[in-house]
Amino acid sequence: MIYTLTLNPSVDYKIVLKEFQEESLNYALNNNFFAGGKGINVSTVLKNLGKPSTALGFLGGFTGDYIRFSLDSRGIKNDFIKIKYDTRLNIKMIANGRETEINANSPDISENEFELLKNKLKNLANNSTLVMSGSVPAALGEDAYNEIANSISNDVKLIIDTSGKPLRKILRLNPFLIKPNIYELEDLFNAKFDSTKELIKIGKNLVESGVQNIIISMGSDGAIFIGGKNVAFRAFVPKINFVSTIGAGDSVIAGFVYAFDNGSTLEDSFKFGVAAGTATALKGNLCEFQDVKKMLCQIRVEDIYTS
């Protein structure tokens, strides 16, 4: 069984304008509300690909009710802990050919509410996959992912997509997969990586330190996969005009999990994940199965272990 965990979900208000003029009345070309949060995005893409999952985390208030209704209406199983305060509302604006995001503060989460979540996660079946994605609410502290990981079975496959201090903390957990981008790695190591060779080296160092597999996303330059047992690949993506990168990284995770859970090799799972992420960026919305299949033949993967 596949589970996704979103500690800091949101209702995302996506608004598209031809151009944005400050201190003036602006009219949207289109606007929509979405159930947001990285883990929720992973569950949504998995559903689009035909793979069931259960979305977990915290929801509260009218915004939380909207997310639950949205997931229920799409047939995405969910089992969130209900909290006292409202789930946040985030704004994603596309204007003047650029993306701007405004994220609201996370709600307060009580110690009792956190304990309820950890107790729920203790009961995950052996051989399950748990995808923990996104930021950690300030009320829980930067050790939240570690506390959760320590409360579940060692037989649960941990996939973690986060950044900053929570990313640094989870490296000691020996997760099955992490997926930082270049900027998150630069922040993690307080260094600048100017070449693919440097990224490969740092990826190998992370694997040697205990991370089982790592996907380093490089935007329009594709992605790198580093694993144990002399496994290293680079994926090249077609030169296309991306509509929006929002949700692309979550689609990479979902595509990888989908393929690997179906018995694909690490290489093929990586390729499918990159195809999913690229399809989402090209479409501007979370990809569907046919989008990924169409993109798959345009993704080229090379073995780079000796690079």
Curated annotation (Swiss-Prot):
It comes from the Bacteria. The active site is at D250 (proton acceptor). Keywords: ATP-binding, Kinase, Nucleotide-binding, Transferase. The keyword Transferase applies. Its EC number is 2.7.1.56. Catalyzes the ATP-dependent phosphorylation of fructose-l-phosphate to fructose-l,6-bisphosphate. NCBIfam families: 1-PFK, pfkB. This is 1-phosphofructokinase. It comes from Borreliella burgdorferi (strain ATCC 35210 / DSM 4680 / CIP 102532 / B31).
